[in-house]
């Protein structure tokens, strides 16, 4: 199997949903998977209990016991861009440390799914000289791109694809998240695939996050691309 990133055209496009879904689908095949969120922001307080939504979702739906120390690099309380959230706490994000963590995880698990934060160009330092995209390039790992199906997604997706391809980052496929089946959404999907005929999967709009457990994408060309890269299947 291949280690990879899950990245998005923007914040809140469904990267965590897709990361969790791919984690579960691959776990069902008997693979040892670790989802890794290099940087997460926005601590949530609930009845004297605090947590972060991304890693909490991994743990809730995982079919395997996850090592908490392996799931995250940095967590910051403020729900903001990583560089600003870190600044508020007087911290700096050590990119080399993140890359070393990713390398260690690759040597320890069948598949590492690294989930991005926000969009590709989100800055990681106050000088705004290092972005998430720089980390992806340095990691030398391919990506799965998550995008919306709604109005505006064509432009956002094509711009993101241009940024990835201009840096020779291998795009394994596209996940269209939140589909309601409207004619406009179907045309958006068709148009994007005309520009970039990649493996893909479509996830319907979820009325409740618990519906995630019922989604199956193992029949999609995207999943075939991911699992088909495993030499054990040949």
Curated annotation (Swiss-Prot):
GO molecular function: ATP binding; dethiobiotin synthase activity; magnesium ion binding
Active site per UniProt: 37
Swiss-Prot/TrEMBL cofactor(s): Mg(2+)
Keywords assigned: ATP-binding, Biotin biosynthesis, Cytoplasm, Ligase, Magnesium, Metal-binding, Nucleotide-binding
Reaction(s) catalysed by this chain's protein: (7R,8S)-7,8-diammoniononanoate + CO2 + ATP = (4R,5S)-dethiobiotin + ADP + phosphate + 3 H(+)
Biological-process GO terms, alphabetical: biotin biosynthetic process
A Pfam cross-reference name: AAA_26
Enzyme Commission number, as recorded: 6.3.3.3
Binding locations of substrate: 41
Keyword Glycosyltransferase: no
Location of the protein in the cell: Cytoplasm
Annotated positions binding Mg(2+): 16, 54, 115
Metabolic or biological pathway, per its Swiss-Prot or TrEMBL entry: Cofactor biosynthesis; biotin biosynthesis; biotin from 7,8-diaminononanoate: step 1/2
An example Gene Ontology CC term for this record: cytosol
Residues reported to bind ATP: 12-17, 54, 115-118
NCBIfam families: bioD (TIGR00347)
Subunit field text: Homodimer.
Function: Catalyzes a mechanistically unusual reaction, the ATP-dependent insertion of CO2 between the N7 and N8 nitrogen atoms of 7,8-diaminopelargonic acid (DAPA, also called 7,8-diammoniononanoate) to form a ureido ring.
Family: Belongs to the dethiobiotin synthetase family.
Full protein name: ATP-dependent dethiobiotin synthetase BioD
Organism: Lysinibacillus sphaericus (strain C3-41)
Gene that specifies this protein: bioD
